[in-house]
A protein has these predicted regions:
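Extracellular, repeat-based ectodomains that mediate carbohydrate processing or recognition
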Residues: 1-244
Length: 244
């Protein structure tokens, strides 16, 4: 147990962790019993096949956990909406069933209070985004926002200071780090840019917003085997500066 972990702080101020149980091939959740998380309540949320090999968790506008994850058995993007703060049960939805989709998943809550999910479409080699239609995320608007080459691996999503989604991801075709800046709250369109093209770079990226309101991205430089950081110069993350 303990693969593909993702952690957030719940409305009760305690840690909530999603992860993959590789032995049982289940999506599991651990709700910390105290601030130090020296013990936790463990729940197998989804046991229907090989599910949860990649997970991402956030807290919804209703104060309950929302987990996006990959169903490897059916090759679907799935979402679990926790029924209580401890997440001892959840409503499970197969959100995107159009091909081999849902790996490299990342979830956040948009300015509209609804879930926004980035992930890979391995059938069509695209970066896709799902914008939840309700708090439970039982339905969503699905959009392929980058379709040029083999793109969308190991995505990371956040909400920029402009209230729009900002996604970092790996372009495997060109070996580049790319960023997509959503054009609207639903992210039905986006501006995409390769922000580091120096060698084979950009896998395993993570993105957040700094105190200056600009994106900050960490990622792997596989050519030089180094950790790199890109600091966005504006809300669109174009141009940018790099540090290593």
């Amino acid at each position: 147990v303990g693969e593909s972990t993702s952690i957030t702080i719940g409305a009760d101020g305690l840690g909530l962790i999603s992860y993959f149980d590789g032995t049982g091939e289940n999506l599991e959740v651990a709700h910390c019993d105290n601030t130090n998380c020296t013990s936790a309540t463990i729940t197998a949320l989804d046991t229907g096949g090989n599910v949860g090999s990649t997970t991402s968790i956030t807290i919804g506008a209703d104060g309950l956990g929302l987990i996006a994850y990959f169903d490897e058995t059916n090759e679907n993007l799935k979402v679990a909406h926790c029924s209580n703060i401890n997440c001892t049960s959840a409503t499970i939805t197969a959100l995107d069933t159009g091909g081999n989709v849902g790996d490299g998943v990342s979830i956040t809550i948009g300015a509209d209070g609804l879930g926004l999910i980035s992930y890979s479409d391995d059938t069509n080699l695209n970066l896709k985004v799902a914008h939840c239609s309700n708090t439970n995320c039982t339905a969503a608007t699905i959009t392929a926002i980058d379709t040029v080459g083999d793109v969308g691996l190991n995505t990371s999503i956040t909400i920029g200071s402009d209230g729009l989604g900002l996604i970092s991801y790996y372009d495997e075709t060109n070996g580049d780090l790319k960023v997509a800046h959503c054009s609207n709250t639903n992210c039905t369109a986006a501006t995409t840019i390769a922000i580091d093209t120096g060698g084979n770079v950009g896998d395993f990226s993570q993105i957040t917003i700094g105190t200056d309101g600009l994106g900050l991205i960490s990622y792997l430089d596989m050519t030089n085997l180094e950790l790199k950081v890109a600091h966005c110069a504006n809300q669109f993350c174009s141009p940018y500066s790099r540090r290593r």
